[in-house]
């Protein structure tokens, strides 16, 4: 039985790695795998740049176009699109969210990339 630890919060990476290591130290039939590749935000951003030619310049907030694009692909309400458009703030780090179909398409591709990247890391960690 495999227990796989993945997460998208930087503050949780060490704890997940420690949990997997502790489980493995106990022996037994369960094996823990910590998969840091899921949290490869630099890789996600690089894929966005190379695939779509979208480059961000941080505005100093804890916000990224690529992350909002993935959120929009799952549920556009989470990026408050209508409110942003009405307030004249429909961009993140200099990249427009208008029209909404564009960040949704970008988000879908980035989620596919992240999924493939993570699955490859899991398979490698399992020796497959």
Task: Describe each model-derived feature in a short phrase.
Residues 1-128:
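Extended, histidine- and acidic-residue-enriched regions that form the cofactor-binding/catalytic faces
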